[in-house]
């Protein structure tokens, strides 16, 4: 059984990468919300001197790889993250791993929200979960906010921010944020190609298997040599980036 709590910086960070924001359409309808045992969570937090606020938690729309809820603890907004219910693929939705990364990454990469609390006691919510820093802003999915709609340069603006944010993540030295032992960087690209090959073989009867085989062979012949490791984001896309409400810069 493990519970970990970290504090939040006193200053406001102007940028961050996270799924959470508050504006119309960002929350699931009440009828679609997946309920949690909030009384159990409140008891768990209270035992550690943390107060779960009286405001009803609200589930964020989208992001069903994990379930995300806006909550209030000690008078501040925060986000509870937990895996979805049911069986999970091996290694997926690892809250402990994510907590470890977020607890350190924000020091060198301010686009990352800071982790605040982690619990792996299944009796609380039925699964490990964490609470992370809340970042207000706008998430773009299928509709542009009015101030960006109709601007011909909006595609360039958003694409550049997306690429620059990802490049900044790659530039972080894992050792500088205490993540030197994270993962297995040696042979990562070769293992990735092998994984793609296995998934393509699983659907070979449904698609052009010859073309897939040629692509896999091409990739295997061109796997780059190992280089110093970098951090990567396995699901980096536009709706995983928050835009600040005032500047429309990534935060």
Map each language-model feature to its residues:
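Juxta-kinase regulatory segment immediately upstream of eukaryotic protein kinase catalytic domains
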Residues: 21-50
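ATP-binding pocket architecture of kinase catalytic cores
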Residues: 55-214, 222-228, 245
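Catalytic-loop of the protein kinase fold
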Residues: 231-233, 238
């Amino acid at each position: 059984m493990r519970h970990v709590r970290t504090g939040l910086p006193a200053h406001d960070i102007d940028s961050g990468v996270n799924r959470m924001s508050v504006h119309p359409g960002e929350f699931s309808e009440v009828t679609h919300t997946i309920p949690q045992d909030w009384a159990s969570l409140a008891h768990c937090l209270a035992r550690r001197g943390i107060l779960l606020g009286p405001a009803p938690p609200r589930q964020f729309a989208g992001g069903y790889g994990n379930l995300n809820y806006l909550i209030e603890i000690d008078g501040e907004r925060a986000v509870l993250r937990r895996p979805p219910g049911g069986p999970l693929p091996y290694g997926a939705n690892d809250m402990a791993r994510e907590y470890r990364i977020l607890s350190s990454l924000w020091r060198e990469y301010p686009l990352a929200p800071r982790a605040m609390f982690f619990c792996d006691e299944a009796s609380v919510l039925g699964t490990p979960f964490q609470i992370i820093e809340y970042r207000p802003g706008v998430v773009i999915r299928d509709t542009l906010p009015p101030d960006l709609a109709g601007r011909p340069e909006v595609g360039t603006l958003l694409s550049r921010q997306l690429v620059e944010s990802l490049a900044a993540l790659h530039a972080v030295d894992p050792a500088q944020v205490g993540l030197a032992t994270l993962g297995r960087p040696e042979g990562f690209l070769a293992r990735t190609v092998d994984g793609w090959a296995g998934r393509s073989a699983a659907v070979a009867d449904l698609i052009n298997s010859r073309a897939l085989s040629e692509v896999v062979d091409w990739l295997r012949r061109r796997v780059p040599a190992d280089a110093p490791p970098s951090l990567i984001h396995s699901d980096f896309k536009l709706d995983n980036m928050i835009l600040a409400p005032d500047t429309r810069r990534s935060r």
